């Protein structure tokens, strides 16, 4: 325990020092970048225009989700109806997070009040142990609420959720097991310890739990998971496998495959985006440059791939067989844009800001942003859940809206020369 605590303390001191340096170095970089912008009015207007549309769309969706005194969780809209999910669904925290982002973008306390209601129906999730996505579910809801309003009790929920997620850590392979091997749509696959690249997105919860509690356990689990994933999930070109299955006895790899991509050896688009975002986040909390370098290499794969469209809204899989006659995935584009704005603040590489801006422009166009009053109230159209499972194909998805609003917030801060965190 003493050794682990010292390891954490040293890393955490480094993190705090890095954070201070970033605050000033990044501010200088961002101010220089903001001064160099040649079309500030256009950039400001695209943010304001999206906020105006989002107020109408997300307001309509929130109204629909609060009828009859019952708070429901909207996930998508298809066949003329809103689909709602239970609190234990992996996407259950995104709409609450979207409402928090609406508060952040507008300053209107009515959004904060709504966000609290939609957040607190997720209270039981802090004890959920049968899948890994509690990081998404709780940090995007309670985490944003704590950050923006410092709501009493929210910090405790985050720490308890990390305790629950830590029960899924498998010490022999050194990973957080994503799915139970015998439960859900993957239960027939014969896996022992499946880990999906999406799991990188749950690590922020663990880093924050250590920050809040002082317990190094969560930090160390997150680092071990990130390191093993870096070693096992990526090919030589920095594309990634969706699923790696580990042997719980030996810790070795039993197999590499896909669940939501086109083929075991293909590059499922959203998986690449999760990797870029996840490793950039790991860099933010650890200061370990390996993570940022890795995120940049995965980003390079995406941007250089021959099948990346000019508008930077990827096809659902970079190796899908019928490109260009394949569905695009707007959710992937939104995740990439948000991650790229953060990467820009650490690297000063204008490429990331330029590409993020291009994505925001694309998603703000009529090709991808819904007309006011349509799309069931969702902001963006044309996302893909899982084509192999026939699930949520070419529909709006709540996490596409979430990451798009996050990208707008980050864009605004970058262009104002402000720190993102």
What does each model-identified segment do?
Residues 41-421:
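Glycan-recognition and catalytic cores of secretory/periplasmic carbohydrate-active enzymes
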Residues 1-45:
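Bacterial Sec-dependent N-terminal signal peptides
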